[in-house]
Amino acid sequence: MVRSNLLAGCLLLAAPFARAQEGVASGTITDSHGEAVAYCTVSLRRTADSTVVTGVVSDTLGRYRLAPLSEESCFLEFAHVAYETALRAVPPGREAFVCDVVLQPANNRIDEVTVLSRFVERRAGRYTVSLVGNPLARDRLLNDLLVLLPGMRQEQNRTFKINGREIRQIYIDDRPATADELKALPAESVKTVEIQRFASSDQEIAARGAVLRITLRPLADGGYRGTAMSWLCMRDNGFSNTGFQFPLTMRYGRFNLYNQLSYSYFEELHEYTRQADYDDEALAIRSTETERTDHHTFTDRLNLVWEVTPHHRLGLTGGFSYASSVPDLVSSSLHYPSGASLPAAGSSFASHGELDNHIWQATASYRWLRDEEGSQLKADFDYVDFASDKRYRYDEQTEGAPSAVTTESQHPRNRLFLAETSFTEVLNEHLTLQAGGEYYWRDIRRRTLTAEDGSPSGLSTFRYRGNGAAVYGDAELSLDWFELVGGVRMQWDRVDHFTGGDTRWRRRDYWRLCPNVNATFILEQERGTTLDLAYTRDGSYIPYDMLSPLRIRESEFRYTVGNPELTPSRGYDLDAVLTLRERWTLSYTYSRGEDMIERMTFTDPDDPQQSYEQPVNCSTMGKHMLSLSYAGPLTKWWRVNWELYGTRGFYRYAGITHRVQSGGIYLSNSLQFAPGFGMTVQFSLESPYEHPGRRHNAMHNLGATLYKYLCKNRLYLNLEARCLLQNDNVNWMWSVTDGYRSCQRHRSRRSFIFTAAYFFNNYKGKRDIQRTQTLQKITNEYR
């Protein structure tokens, strides 16, 4: 009995050591460009009959670990839908077998029915799509690929939305970018696309919202990547616009160089018919207006990043933009007494303007990459100087009255300095902390000189000085089935402004605290089924561009004016998003706002025929938004992104509660007839909707794009037709304080755009390209 117990004890003690002798296979899986291949199936198979002994799937870094190894003769199989299957023999008797594998792209074309979840990683409030080896990226520009992702759509004004929420910020390798820049990027040159649905604490309060982050494929020493793109657009009644883009990225030694050169010439044409009724004056005025503006815009941005050491990087950016425009407006009007069928008088109005904008921008940045897990220290400093000269001439002629000529000269000047620093600490694979701070300083000067019939009649000035600071913090918890991000931002803003005629500067201080919480429940990892919940407290920006009470002439009977009494609005959003198998998306949002800024219409008490718009803190808003979308393939050659959405809520203003509701559909269809040859068809329909003091008619629009790749996918040709089926845009506006109301009809025009692009690149490796993060966008004024 003693011997039996002793033998059993020896066997128990020996078991862990026997387990330790079992073989383990591990390694990293990459592609021919050195990129990690995620979600690759690694199978251990018997040599005799190829039956599977065990298997694993590689992680997002391409790593795998497979145990235990069989004592029989076996081999490893590496299978991925985008690559050729690789086989590696396992040496018998090995305790530790390290096998790194480089997969080659699949020679056969992968059908669009590939499961998207293989390339998607979901985190709290955001998801990342890997485009390396992704069949969606083949023969597409990035602009065309984005609208095929779950919940995404592109509006007619070329902006993007995710689940009905506008994407307010776009970054390409940390650099703020515009939607137009995305059309010059082949999707296959992009490493990852990250879509952040909800706000985070590092966002300025006014800019909190959805974010799109693009990470380009890396280059090594001597590598380069560029696009030469040009386009020509014609309307159905003549020329519209032309231009070119030339982005270029290079790496030389420890230096990364990026340059974005662009030019555009745009002939903007708008045709309006208006009818304004003045009940208090017993008068109606009917007008036809033609507004034509010629724009010239030249922009160049040069960025240089120096990798001082593998962990320390310095960046410098210089940017310049010059824009000129010539706006012309011609209007003719007929004046009808109330109830009369014949006009009692007529009038004409013409305006001519000449505008020149100069913008200079300088940015410096520092990065300390503390470890390979993502811990880092960031510091950015940004300065922008904007100067403009605007000259206007207004000619007015009314029957029975002498003609009048008024000239205006405006000289706005804006300067902005912004500094930001943040620290990210990855404690372990489950917990990440982030903290940071910001400071800004802004100075705006606007001066208007007015002359009537050649004699100076007035000088108006407006000054604005603002500065503010913010601190914020985030914590991210990551588990296998659950992701949670919680953060808070505290921001202080000081506003000082002065208008000519005031006896002193006006000052206001604002303190705001905005928390945010995002949670993601991963219901089915392999099938891509998740549930996202979010709460975001936010507020509007300091309305510095709406404070000036100086008049800006719009047409013969309209002008706009600011409001020095404006304050930022405040509110919150509640969101829930259910994603089923990376294809179906059901989204719900409830938004609540207080002191909302609305542009209200009033009549001038000194001249009742003149109406003006003025922003006012006047409304309380509550709105429910619901959308259902499907993004996926219908056949091997037809992929769609369809969305049905609707809103219902209320606006409370001027003591009146007004119920509003609207809905619409969005249909995006991507057709691929052959490799490198395809077509995109988009259709949208939106019901009428209403806001305080205005109402919009129902709108529908149909557009189509035909594209072809030539010369081994280096030459890209595109023909796009916009507004093939679109009705006129009709707006009704009224005053809530008097008897003024008007109706404006904007005539829609078809347009056709031909685009040609040449792509050239030489990646030569896998070192990441870094760019200085500019904190501000360059924005020109054309009016």
Language-model features: locations:
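Short acidic/polar hinge/loop motifs at secondary-structure boundaries
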Residues: 142, 148, 175-200, 246
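Short, acidic, small-residue-rich periplasmic hinge/interaction motif at the N-terminus
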Residues: 43-45, 79-83, 96-135, 155-157, ...
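Short, acidic Ser/Thr/Gly-rich low-complexity loop/linker segments typical of extracellular
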Residues: 48-63
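Outer-membrane beta-barrel translocator/receptor signature
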Residues: 205-213, 220-272, 295-298
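Face-selective signature of the C-terminal outer-membrane beta-barrel domain
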Residues: 299-323, 349-500, 524-530, 584-587, ...
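Surface-exposed extracellular loop regions of Gram-negative outer-membrane beta-barrel proteins
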Residues: 215-230, 268-275, 286, 298-302, ...
